[in-house]
Every structure is written in structure tokens, then in C-alpha cells.
A protein has these predicted regions:
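Short coil/turn linking the two alpha-helices of tandem helical-hairpin repeats
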Residues: 86, 90, 139-143, 200-204, ...
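Residue-level detector of extended alpha-helical repeat arrays and alpha-solenoid scaffolds
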Residues: 75, 128-131, 148, 189, ...
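Bacterial Sec-dependent N-terminal signal peptides
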Residues: 5-37
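Oxyanion-binding "anion nests"
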Residues: 250-263, 267-284
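Extended ligand-binding groove/face enriched in aromatic
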Residues: 97-202, 206-213
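CBM-like carbohydrate-recognition segments
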Residues: 26-81, 85-126, 161, 184, ...
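Active-site cradle of extracellular carbohydrate-active enzymes
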Residues: 189, 196-200, 208-259
């Protein structure tokens, strides 16, 4: 079934007439992979090599030599892997689950390694948004209301207040730093919409759904290309700049998908599917997501894991056409097979490190936590898809 047919079957007129990605010939692994065991190994490697277990926060390099001063927003994605593991094992391994719950408490006590404030506020809007999303996941996993309260307070006081109307239209500004406040970025608006949607999910306050729609409408009408499904990086001085990145494709998919679930408007689903198709067909080489980083010690090494997180939710949604879901699941599975069998040297466990290029193992230079988080996110996703 083509993507056009899949959407037409939902009674949608405005369809995407693109080619579906077909990874079916790439699904054979060189050996049988136990994804739960693989995820356990990836989680332990992340925690043992990169976490300060007295603080629950993560250091940039495995040997502790890197400067952690600006190591903030990635903390959210690293803790998300711990939450993934917690949710997977809490009913079967109470002792380890309790340890992971303690790490969440410590992470919160130290404000996710926030380098500029005793709370979660930050000059960069997207940095706070990722922290808020992780706090909400911690609340969802544990029921600890303090996490939700901090998430709500941070969003209400320091995120949605950065919505401005200027020559770029609306949109959340990227940063309050001088010279950066004129930039409206996909990286601040995609996660911003997700924050509002998740707060609506757990508070049922209509203002959050209204704000999510507002943020998403700006993003969709400016940086999103409805013909291709690509999401540009930013708009500055009324001019669109920068090409698509897996970070922005992923958060656009996530916010569109959640809006579809909350409203039933199939336009959101169409846009989510288009964005996913663009990633699979135009941002991959031989079926493997492109490496968007020039080095392992780069925030770009986190980007692929962001796409994986939100594409996984889309692939798991049983209300969406089964052929599309299989396509997306197979794409991620192919990436995971190559990453786990070719892109990591497991001979020195737990000193095993993912590379930012999932097709080749790391070298000693690559012992940074950003690619480790993306790799572990991918492997954890396999435990949900299989």
C-alpha cells in the first residue's frame, strides 16, 4: 500500500503522494538479538560510564575530563533513557527500579545540572523545554507530583512567556540572549508544543491545548514544507534558514501526532506521516539515519535519538494504518540491527560506547555521552516495538 492509499483509506483528501520506504530486505540480523538484554547492557553502559551516581546527573565524557559547564539540555535525554528502563523493569526487578527512582530524585534535587540557576530556568528556551518534558515523564512514571509542579511552573513562567509576534509572525524565541531573541527556531517550537500537550494530558486545562495549537500552527505554517515533509531550522528577520534535522523532524512528528490524538483532526496525522517519510527517504543513507554531527562531543549527536523517541510513539499507535506503522518500525529496527551489530564494540562491557555514526564502532576519541544517549534510546525503543 502506498502512503497515499494509506491516508486515503482514512477518508483524507489531502494526501502525501510520496514513495514509502521499504526496508524489508534489510531486516536480517547476523544473529538473534535479545532486545531486552541489549537494552539492559546499553542502560548500564550509560549509567556506569557517564552518571555521577551521587547527583543523578551525567558528565559529558566517560573519563570525566570534559567541561560540564554547558551540559544541561542533554541531561533530559539521558534521564529519559533511565525512565525508559525503569518503565520496562519496574514490575520484574524491584531493586533496580528503586535505584533508578532514586536517580530521578537526585537529578531533580540538582535541577538536571542547570548551570545558570537554582531552578530550571535558562536563557535557551529549548533547554528548559526538554527538562520540562523529562519532569513530566518522571511524574508519569512515579506519580511524584513535585515533578509535575516544577514542569508546570517552568513552562508557565519561563517558556510560554517567550511567545512573541514580530516579522517572523508568532513563535517561541530561541533564547533571551541578545542577538538570539530575534530567532524563532524549530528546536524551541516543536518541543514547546509538546510541553503544552503533555501538560494538557495530565492537567486537562484547556489553555495548554490552545497554546499547543497556537505554537504548532506557527511551526507548520512557517518552517514545515507541506510538499516534502521537511522542517527547516529557523526563521530570522522574516527569512527561513537551515535544512531539516532529525531533532526537528522528531519533535514535529511528536506534536502533530499528539494533536491528532487529542483533536481527531487527520490533518495533523498527515503532517506527522509526511515528516516521518521525509526522514526515512531523504535523511538516510542505505536505510541508516545520517550522522548529523561532526564529532561525538556535539549536541547534534543527540538528534537521532529524538527522532527515534517520537517516531516510536507513532509506530506504536494502533489507530494508525498498519502498513505505515510497519514501514516506520522496520526502518528503526534496521537502524538498531546495524547499530548493535556493527556500530559498537561490546568486547569490554560495560565500557561499551556508541558512535555518532551507527555503522562503525567508536574509537577512544568518541567516549562522549551524546551519542551514547542516542544509541541507548534506539535500543530501548526496540523493546517496545518487538
Amino acid at each position: 500500500m502506498t502512503a497515499a492509499a494509506a491516508l486515503a483509506s482514512c477518508g483524507v483528501d489531502d494526501v502525501y503522494y510520496g514513495e514509502m520506504y521499504d526496508p524489508s530486505s534489510l531486516m536480517d540480523a547476523p544473529y538473534q538479538i535479545d532486545w531486552d538484554a541489549a537494552a539492559d547492557s546499553a542502560d548500564v553502559a550509560l549509567i556506569d560510564n557517564f552518571m555521577d551516581k551521587d547527583r543523578g546527573t551525567f558528565q559529558l565524557s566517560a573519563d570525566g575530563s570534559a567541561n560540564n559547564q554547558f551540559n544541561y539540555w542533554g541531561q533530559a535525554h539521558a534521564m529519559d533513557v533511565v525512565i525508559d528502563a525503569y518503565l520496562r523493569i519496574k514490575d520484574t526487578d524491584a531493586e533496580r527500579a528503586a535505584t533508578y527512582e532514586k536517580y530521578m530524585e537526585l537529578w531533580h534535587q540538582h535541577r538536571g545540572n542547570n548551570y545558570s540557576s537554582p531552578d530550571y530556568r535558562n536563557d535557551f528556551t529549548d533547554d528548559m523545554e526538554w527538562i520540562v518534558l523529562t519532569l513530566i515523564r518522571m511524574y508519569e512514571a512515579t506519580g511524584e507530583k513535585d515533578y509535575l509542579d516544577y514542569a508546570k511552573d517552568t513552562y508557565d513562567q519561563h517558556i510560554i512567556t517567550r511567545w512573541t509576534v514580530d516579522e517572523n509572525g508568532g513563535g517561541l524565541i530561541w533564547s533571551i540572549e541578545s542577538g538570539r531573541e530575534i530567532s524563532k527556531n524549530a528546536c524551541s517550537n516543536g518541543p514547546g508544543a509538546l510541553c503544552a500537550l503533555r501538560l494538557y494530558e495530565f492537567t486537562q486545562e484547556e489553555k495548554y491545548l490552545d497554546q499547543a495549537k497556537m505554537i504548532y500552527e506557527w511551526l507548520s505554517s512557517t518552517l514545515y514544507d507541506s510538499e516534502t515533509g521537511s522542517v527547516a531550522d529557523n526563521m530570522k528577520n522574516g527569512v527561513i534558514n537551515g535544512g531539516a534535522l532529525s531533532y526537528n523532524q522528531g519533535t514535529f512528528i511528536g506534536s502533530a501526532h499528539m494533536l491528532y490524538n487529542f483533536t481527531g483532526d487527520k490533518r495533523y496525522l498527515i503532517e506527522a506521516m509526511r515528516a516521518a517519510e521525509y526522514q526515512m527517504n531523504n535523511m538516510s543513507t542505505d536505510g541508516i539515519m545520517n550522522s548529523e554531527a561532526s564529532s561525538a562531543n556535539s549536541d547534534n549527536s543527540l538528534f537521532k535519538g529524538i527522532f527515534i523517541r517520537y517516531a516510536t510513539l507513532l509506530a506504536l499507535d494502533e489507530n494508525i494504518d498498519a502498513s505505515f506503522r510497519k514501514e516506520l518500525s522496520d526502518f528503526m529496527t534496521h537502524n538498531a540491527i546495524v547499530c548493535w551489530t556493527q556500530g559498537i564494540d561490546k568486547s569490554s562491557y560495560p565500557a561499551i560506547f556508541f558512535n555518532y555514526d551507527w555503522t562503525v564502532p567508536y574509537t577512544d576519541y568518541y567516549k562522549y555521552y551524546q551519542p551514547q544517549v542516542s544509541g541507548a534510546t534506539l535500543i530501548e525503543a526496540m523493546t517496545r516495538l518487538h
